[in-house]
Every structure is written in structure tokens, then in C-alpha cells.
């Protein structure tokens, strides 16, 4: 039996306005999203008109038949895309007759190349939190919010060119064999090599959470993370630099933590979950101070099937459909009224979010990518 997913009030009130996916309870001081990130988001959408409400109801429950249409859907492959296929693509195809051709190499650069060459072959693309902002307006079609239920999407996750399709968390995962039965309380323990000896895993990417978690460990409140104090973050990272083991992709992070190559790791919650539940390794998640983020759906400018793409995106973000991939992978919905399987709810980032959770300021990170990346590369090679 399924039940309606009740997201924490903090999220519905705007805690996810910084968007871009229980191992220990956390006390929750009152915090709000950072001012710079909140300011980059549009105001809440106006109530839908009667005509818009009717169009939305139709696309959610009886999307138009479109036999003969083939949509090219690009995502990231693996278990993630398999969950999207089972949760969305296959049911939508059965309802509408739309066929899907898939690409498993979603890339911002590929979107840019296709659009600028005038040879657009992708129709719907799942992108990370670093894409789909106003800075990318020349590459994307504005979304059709007469169809997409903008008022039901977490605040800040439905903007002009992108709408969040799944949520996940950047979390602290730990190998219980390596921590001697002790439970790290947050990122400060990740940086405490005396209390918790051992190697530390982290993503080899400048904007994947390495600076944010260093600042959280150093006492910066989630609401005060941006603009990032890079000097302070690097000083904190220097305290564990000799013990850091970088991972280039999610599969490697799962392998490292499961094998005990690292005692703790900065990871995506789905990979940590898989290490425990699929690989059957002694791995747990500390949800305290997770960084909540999302993936988004976009339509490249010049898509040959723009209207069909809008219908599909609208259907995936409807309350009755949005949580379907979470039956196959522990990534959560963005629709606040989403219906979720109770067997998976406890493993979702969005369910475990509270006032201690942090949020990427996507607009700030995009605007400052060059400086952040330079600081990261200089630190790593010193």
C-alpha cells in the first residue's frame, strides 16, 4: 500500500529554495536558506487558472495519445536511469504510445554542442543542479507551466528553464567496522582523525560538496555557507589532506566505503544505500548536515518534439507519478503531494531533511565556478 509523502514543513516552507539526492538524529536549530540563493529564485507561482487546472488534470491522469512520436531521453545511465525507465518511461509509453530512445551520457556540453550546431537530437534531458539556470537561457526552451504543476513543486525547484524531478542528498556515509561501533555525529567527526582514525573518501570535484562540508565542520551555519569562504575551507581540508582518497564517480565511492578502503565518505545517499542494501556491506548514513540537492529536467532549444517533451515532463512531475522512481532507487520526489511507497520513505533525503540540512546555492556556484575550481585544483596539487 502506498501513502502520500508528507515532507518536512521546512522544505515546503522554502528550505529547498537553494536547489539544484537515518543514521543518527539531529537537533534542529532554526535556520533558513542563504539570502543569496533565495534571492535568485522566482516568487511563488500564482494559482492556476481554471483552464490551466483542467489542462494539468488531464495530463496527470489521461495524457494525450501520441502514437508515432519518439522522444529521446538523456540521463546518467546505471541504476538511476533504470529507475527512471521503470518509474516513468515505460508507464508513460503504455499510456500514450510514445516511444523512447535513450541516451545514458547526459552532458551539459552535449546540449551546448547540439544547440549551437543546429542539430538537436535530445528532447528531454536529466541534468544536475549546475544547469538549467538563467545563465543557460540560450540553450533551453522555457517550460510550459500551463501543464507542469508548478504550485506543487518544492519552492525554487520549478523555474523558467528547469523543473526538479528527483531529490537526493550529499551525505556522510561510514563503515561501521572502521568506526568501531561509534556513530559520527556530523562533518566535524569526518574531520576528526583522533576520534575517528582512517581514510576519508570524497568526490574529486570542486563543486560537489567538498568546500561546503569543510565549512560545516568548521562551524559555519548552513544558512551562512555562501558566498563560500574558500580560504577557510582549504585550511580545514588541510587538516585531513593526507588521509583523503578521491573518488571519480559514484560506483567507486560505493566500492571504497563497502570494502573499508575509507572509514567515512562524502557520498550521494543512493550509493551509500546500495553499499548497505545491495552489496550487504557494514555501511550506514549520517543524515545530519546532509546537503539536499536535485536533478532537473530540461528541453534543449530546438528540440524536434518540444510539445511532446512538455507533456512528458508535466506527467512525471504530477503528484501520482513523481515518486515512482523511488520504488527502485532511494531518490525522492519534488512534488510536495507525491505518493510514495512506505517501504522507501525512510531512505529518502527529502524525508530526512531538517534545519541542520544545507543546500547548494546553484546560481552562486555557476557564477563563481572558475574561482572555485581554480582554488580546488591549486589546493589539490600543492
Question: Where are the model-predicted features located?
Answer:
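Bacterial lipoprotein signal-peptidase II cleavage site
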Residues: 21-35
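Early extracytoplasmic/lumenal segment of secretory-pathway proteins
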Residues: 54-135
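Extracytoplasmic ligand-binding site segments that recognize negatively charged/polar headgroups
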Residues: 72-85, 120-261
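A ligand-binding cleft/hinge motif common to bilobed small-molecule-binding domains
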Residues: 131-136, 258, 264-282
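Periplasmic-binding protein-like
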Residues: 168-170, 195-207, 230-239, 278-303, 316-339
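A bilobed periplasmic-binding-protein/Venus flytrap-type ligand-binding module shared by bacterial periplasmic
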Residues: 171-178, 215-219, 293-306, 316, ...
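C-terminal capping/gating helix-and-loop segments adjacent to ligand/active sites or protein-protein/ligand interfaces
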Residues: 323-382
